[in-house]
């Protein structure tokens, strides 16, 4: 096991101090995370294939509904506090034992509320999911999913604590354990218990991962803080800190639905299909790179106090991320029609031009992402919220104007780019003023030259 510092931070697997934040560390952290993510995705595909072959369309659809319920409850009831936990642990704002105690208390309280819903209200949840004609057939299954979502909530906090400790390999291993356990159990649960097995399967993998993750955290925690006192304060602490982030998650959903409604009103379902295809590809592209990096960048930034050291790390993170994203952005731009045809069909090739325009925003989005991690790691949630709300306002207002003036669906993609350009300017201003961050000449020149090259590739 790695040693724990007085602040509760665990040593990195490679080297301590600034070496840990070297370019080599970025490569190692990203390489391992993306490999684990690929394996986890592959195991998920295997699980879905087993469900589709031996369960058929009906059980596949049922599993999809149960997964939405499970994910919605566990993510929604976390109130965005997982980011707060990462910041607490990585910065030493609270000791590891205190953070574990507060998170444990919160999970216990929410678990109790979920138990009440599972016992007394599952029929109403089933009606909301399936309607009255089918609800009575799945009351028991819904109760199981509602109750098991407490395990999902606990796993969110386990992952957050380990992310705060920069335990990249441990987090990846837990995700692999969850995915492999689900894949191994899929055939037995689906063929033996049908719909009830589908309900069990949704949270099955997380049970195994939680056992391992909980055991690891228990070994890392020093001291024996009781989890029997201060329950109300624990909930108040987490919810008050994370409610703003939870509100932003809700805002993101509202923006997505609103923009889709505006596009549908202006360009019909065909236009919505093209816009959704391009947006899905561009957002997935960003997620594939940023999700693995987040487990390393966010907690490492949280452990940096002095602005010069923080600025050095931000510049290094930005340079590495740009070098990683840039060639892939050019490939996405050049192969967009092949990608669209492979993922969808020839009927969606009209989304190619939309995707090309949205690719222009990849470099600004990359810079913005790194600056956003710096703000979150410093606990500047209100500042982060201002930038997110500003971008959401531009997207909704801009799309409304585009549809009102009948400028064409391509203009929607340009609104997307404009929103991220404004977002970048705001993030830069806040980062300089509130964090005293300074992007060096190398980072600025790299971002500007890559933006220019992507633009030239688009125009050619």
Model-based region annotation:
Residues 6-26, 138, 213-256, 296-312, ...:
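Interhelical loop/hinge segments that connect adjacent transmembrane helices in multipass membrane
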Residues 25-40, 66, 75-126, 136, ...:
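Membrane-water interface segments that mark the loop-to-transmembrane alpha-helix transition
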Residues 88, 150-173, 359-390, 431-435:
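Membrane-interface junctions at transmembrane-helix termini in multi-pass inner-membrane proteins
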Residues 122-145, 315, 323, 332-363, ...:
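Interfacial segments at transmembrane-helix termini and the short loops linking adjacent helices
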Residues 77-94, 164, 278, 282-322, ...:
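Helix-loop junctions and terminal segments of transmembrane helices
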Residues 29-32, 140-144, 170, 225-229, ...:
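Membrane-interface "helix-start" segments
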Residues 139-143, 172-221, 237, 279, ...:
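Hydrophobic alpha-helical transmembrane segments
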Residues 2, 21-86, 110-119, 148, ...:
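Signature of the first transmembrane helix
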């Amino acid at each position: 096991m790695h040693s724990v510092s007085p602040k509760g931070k665990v040593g990195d697997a490679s080297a301590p101090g600034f070496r840990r934040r070297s370019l080599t560390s970025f490569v190692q952290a990203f390489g391992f995370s993306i490999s684990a993510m690929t394996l986890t995705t592959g195991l998920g595909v295997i699980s879905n294939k087993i469900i589709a072959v031996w369960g058929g369309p009906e059980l596949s659809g049922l599993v999809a509904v149960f997964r939405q319920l499970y994910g919605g409850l566990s993510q929604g009831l976390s109130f965005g506090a997982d980011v707060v936990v990462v910041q607490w642990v990585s910065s030493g704002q609270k000791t590891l034992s205190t953070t574990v105690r507060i998170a444990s208390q919160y999970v216990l309280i929410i678990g109790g509320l979920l138990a009440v819903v599972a016992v007394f209200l599952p029929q109403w949840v089933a009606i909301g999911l399936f309607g009255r004609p089918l609800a009575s057939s799945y009351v028991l299954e819904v109760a199981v999913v509602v109750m098991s979502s407490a395990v999902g909530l606990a796993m969110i906090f386990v992952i957050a604590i380990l992310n705060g400790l920069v335990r990249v390999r441990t987090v990846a291993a837990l995700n692999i354990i969850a995915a492999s356990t689900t894949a191994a159990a899929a055939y037995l649960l689906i063929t033996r218990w049908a719909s009830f097995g589908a309900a069990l399967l949704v949270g099955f993998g997380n049970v195994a991962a939680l056992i391992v993750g909980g055991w690891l955290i228990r070994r890392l925690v020093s001291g024996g803080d009781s989890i029997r006192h201060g329950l109300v304060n624990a909930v108040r602490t987490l919810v008050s800190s994370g409610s703003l982030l939870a509100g932003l998650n809700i805002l993101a959903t509202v923006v997505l639905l609103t923009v889709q409604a505006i596009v549908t009103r202006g360009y019909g379902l065909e236009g919505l299909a093209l816009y959704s295809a391009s947006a899905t590809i561009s957002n997935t592209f960003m997620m594939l790179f940023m999700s693995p990096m987040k487990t390393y960048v966010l907690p490492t930034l949280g452990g940096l106090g002095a602005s010069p050291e923080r600025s050095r790390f931000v510049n290094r993170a930005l340079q590495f991320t740009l070098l990683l994203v840039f060639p892939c952005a050019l490939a996405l731009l050049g192969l967009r029609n092949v990608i669209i045809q492979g993922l969808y069909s020839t009927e969606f090739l009209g989304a190619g031009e939309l995707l090309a325009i949205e690719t222009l925003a990849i470099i600004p989005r990359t810079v913005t992402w790194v600056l956003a991690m710096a703000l979150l790691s410093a606990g500047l949630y209100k500042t982060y919220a201002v930038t997110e709300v500003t971008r959401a306002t531009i997207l909704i207002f801009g799309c409304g104007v585009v549809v009102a003036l009948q400028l064409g669906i391509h203009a929607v993609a340009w609104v997307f780019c404009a929103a991220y350009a404004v977002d970048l300017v705001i993030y830069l201003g806040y980062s300089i003023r509130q964090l005293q961050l300074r992007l060096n000449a190398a980072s600025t020149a790299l971002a500007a030259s890559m933006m220019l090259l992507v633009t030239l590739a688009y125009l050619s």
